[in-house]
């Protein structure tokens, strides 16, 4: 179970000596916990109710599959909330699920472990790669060259955090895209000047919500890489749509 900034998800795995690790179910529910955390500082009672109800349903699903064991993790949205302990206590009392809150370094480590399992990962980092982990509260960039880590930098430009900053600054929705672009480019320009002048990146490995859905519109087999030009074409088409249309196209509605 993963409690993220924008959604809560449950994956059921079957583990056997013959088949290895196989995903047999994947359930996702959109709950924007980070919206409360980064606007009012804590998670509101209504969202706590919704979260507990969702996790109770997850528990029923686990019972249906007769799971032998589980792990439940939460990241920044709960970690940064002033009422973190209250939320965790409510979850435990009302659902019986014990949640482990990951530190930033623990969260990134687990994410990078999953990326490193790819068969061609070693080849990518040998030729030059950037692993970009985009979360709700922050973004972390790790640059690899000749198979070694060159630098890892933490930037405070997560998706939800950016959104909340813009809501406070302006009510003009038409300007959001331009303002987001300016904020991100400003931080990336500093990063590029400090760490990228002498580096060549051939592969961009992105970790984050919905990146799989977007990449899936370019190529069905996501075990392979996606050409950046084709990926940008999909992004350009999506930028012409409204939120409802994008949700429908990506199968998120």
Model-found features: residue ranges?
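Short coil-to-beta-strand
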Residues: 21-31, 150-157
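A generic structural motif
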Residues: 19-24, 66-68
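Gly/Thr-rich phosphate-binding beta-strand-loop-beta motif of the actin/hexokinase/Hsp70
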Residues: 1-21, 123-152, 209
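Hydrophobic residues in beta-strands and at strand termini
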Residues: 31-33, 134
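Short acidic/polar active-site loop segments enriched in Thr and Asp
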Residues: 6, 68, 202
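Helical "lid/coupling" subdomains associated with nucleotide-phosphate turnover
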Residues: 12, 36-65, 77-87, 92-126, ...
């Amino acid at each position: 179970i993963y409690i993220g900034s924008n959604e809560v998800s449950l994956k059921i795995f079957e583990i056997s000596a013959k088949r290895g690790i196989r995903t047999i179910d994947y359930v996702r529910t959109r709950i924007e916990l980070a919206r409360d955390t980064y606007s009012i500082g804590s998670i509101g009672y209504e969202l706590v109710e919704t979260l507990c109800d969702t996790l109770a349903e997850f528990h029923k699903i686990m019972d249906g599959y007769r799971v032998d064991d589980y792990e439940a993790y939460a990241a920044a949205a709960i970690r940064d909330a002033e009422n973190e302990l209250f939320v965790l206590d409510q979850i435990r009392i009302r659902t019986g699920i014990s949640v482990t809150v990951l530190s930033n370094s623990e969260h990134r480590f687990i994410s990078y472990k999953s990326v490193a399992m790819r068969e061609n990962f070693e080849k990518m980092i040998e030729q030059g790669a950037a692993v970009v982990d985009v979360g709700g509260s922050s973004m972390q960039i790790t640059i690899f060259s000749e198979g070694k880590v060159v630098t890892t930098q933490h930037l405070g430009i997560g998706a939800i955090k950016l959104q909340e900053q813009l809501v406070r600054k302006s009510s003009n929705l038409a300007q959001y895209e331009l303002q987001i672009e300016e904020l991100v480019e400003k931080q990336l320009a500093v990063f590029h000047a400090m760490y990228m002048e002498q580096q060549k990146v051939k592969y961009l490995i992105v970790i984050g919500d919905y990146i799989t859905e977007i990449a899936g519109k370019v190529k069905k087999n996501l075990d392979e890489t996606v050409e950046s030009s084709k990926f940008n074409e999909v992004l350009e088409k999506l930028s012409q749509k409204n939120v409802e249309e994008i949700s429908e196209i990506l199968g998120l509605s």
